[in-house]
């Protein structure tokens, strides 16, 4: 079987969804700039050899509608001979794009793919036009479509306290801020034009959503937002609303080597799994277990892990049941996570994978895992290996 490898991976800075730096920048532009960036950074690649552009996006309407993958690729000047498709596995959409490209390469159905994802949550809110079938209530809990309530449920089932959630959120902001000021995000962030608070055009080079002033004391005063009476999940322990895109150049290994392109990581294994929709945040556990089994390794073999922080109340049960509580500070989300950076839905899968690969390089690590939960009860996971 042929090997699928990551040649390059970049992301936009994460912009605040409410009056943020990308308030005047469309989702197609965020996407197209990254596509162009990959080609500029890898001039050995002939764009005419691109098989397909696979782009994750959840809210495929308004500016994100009518196959945003094709719209963005045309904006980017990618040859019209390349295909383009938009995929939707909710929060796991751009990781699904990674998997689709990898499967195509492994089975000989193409050797060069641009993949990624985008979500402009400021322009297209996450609940825009959502209309669940009434019959779903016969099969899943009625609150399963409300992500915050599923986090409350998962946290209660696993005995996660408010204080544990607050501490996890503080850690996310502190680590993301440290990564910013120490330049650890510099290699993965691709600068995009946006606008500052005065409306002036600027090149955005840093994430806008990190709150370095976050403390246990500042979080303690926040009220629960999803279950005001008995809940523990607050805005401060939930992933921030942000706008952003991420992208990767994925190729067949021998072709990349023949062109003299870097092999930043090999895709070792992939998996998806389902779980009860009422505790959708638990999905990373069964997905990770399947991916590890397919890779022939155990969780102890992993050097670095990126777990998407939809909610602290969701992340901590996954960490616990994967047997990772004792190594959180050595292995997990070392540059912070979505609580600090935000979770632009269609962007996040490739974003956490990009952050993971850069962390693996920084730490000279061999094996890494990127995994995330998915609304209505799914998980997705990818094991990467540096070679």
Curated annotation (Swiss-Prot):
Pfam family, any one: Thiolase_C
Main location: cytoplasm
Catalytic activity reported: an acyl-CoA + acetyl-CoA = a 3-oxoacyl-CoA + CoA
UniProt keyword list: Acyltransferase, Cytoplasm, Fatty acid metabolism, Lipid degradation, Lipid metabolism, Transferase
Top-level division of the source organism's lineage: Bacteria
Pathway in which the depicted protein is active: Lipid metabolism; fatty acid beta-oxidation
Active-site residues (renumbered): 91 (acyl-thioester intermediate), 343 (proton acceptor), 373 (proton acceptor)
GO annotation, cellular component aspect: cytoplasm
EC numbers on record: 2.3.1.16
Location of the protein in the cell: Cytoplasm
GO-annotated molecular function: acetyl-CoA C-acyltransferase activity
InterPro entries: FadA, Thiolase, Thiolase-like, Thiolase-like_sf_Thiolase, Thiolase_acyl_enz_int_AS, Thiolase_AS, Thiolase_C, Thiolase_CS
Family per similarity comment: Belongs to the thiolase-like superfamily. Thiolase family.
Assembly and binders: Heterotetramer of two alpha chains (FadB) and two beta chains (FadA).
Primary role: Catalyzes the final step of fatty acid oxidation in which acetyl-CoA is released and the CoA ester of a fatty acid two carbons shorter is formed.
Name of the molecule in the record: 3-ketoacyl-CoA thiolase
Organism: Shewanella oneidensis (strain ATCC 700550 / JCM 31522 / CIP 106686 / LMG 19005 / NCIMB 14063 / MR-1)
């Amino acid at each position: 079987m042929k090997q699928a490898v990551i040649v390059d991976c970049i992301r936009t800075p994460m912009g605040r969804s409410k009056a943020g730096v990308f308030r005047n920048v469309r989702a197609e532009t965020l996407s197209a700039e990254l596509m162009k960036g990959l080609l500029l950074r890898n001039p050995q690649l002939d764009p005419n050899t691109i098989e397909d552009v696979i782009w994750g996006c959840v809210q495929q309407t308004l500016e994100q509608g009518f196959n945003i993958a094709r719209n963005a690729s045309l904006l980017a000047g990618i040859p019209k001979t390349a295909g383009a498709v938009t995929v939707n596995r909710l929060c796991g959409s751009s990781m699904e794009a990674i998997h689709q490209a990898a499967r195509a390469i492994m089975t000989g159905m193409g050797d060069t793919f641009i993949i990624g994802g985008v979500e402009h949550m400021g322009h297209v809110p996450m609940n825009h036009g959502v209309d669940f079938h009434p019959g779903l209530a016969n099969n899943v809990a009625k609150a399963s479509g409300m992500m915050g309530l599923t986090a409350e449920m998962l946290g209660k089932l696993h005995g996660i306290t408010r204080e544990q959630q607050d501490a996890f959120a503080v850690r996310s902001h502190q680590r993301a801020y440290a990564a910013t000021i120490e330049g650890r995000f510099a290699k993965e962030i691709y600068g995009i034009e946006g606008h500052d608070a005065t409306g002036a055009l600027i090149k955005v080079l840093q994430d806008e959503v990190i709150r370095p002033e976050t403390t246990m004391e500042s979080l303690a005063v926040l009220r629960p937002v999803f279950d005001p009476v008995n809940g523990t999940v607050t805005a401060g322990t939930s992933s921030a609303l942000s706008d952003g895109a991420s992208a990767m150049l994925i190729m067949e290994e021998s072709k990349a080597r023949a062109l003299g392109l870097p092999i930043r990581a090999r895709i070792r294994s992939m998996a998806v799994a389902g779980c009860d929709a009422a505790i959708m945040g638990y999905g990373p556990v069964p997905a990770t277990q399947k991916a590890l089994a397919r890779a022939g390794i155990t969780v102890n073999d992993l050097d670095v892990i990126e777990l998407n922080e939809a909610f602290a109340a969701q992340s901590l049960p996954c960490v616990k049941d994967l047997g990772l509580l004792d190594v959180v500070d050595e292995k997990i989300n070392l540059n912070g996570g979505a609580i600090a950076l935000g979770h632009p839905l269609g962007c996040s899968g490739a974003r956490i994978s990009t952050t993971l690969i850069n962390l693996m390089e920084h730490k000279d690590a061999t094996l890494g895992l990127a995994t995330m939960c998915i609304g209505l009860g799914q998980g997705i996971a990818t094991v990467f290996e540096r070679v």
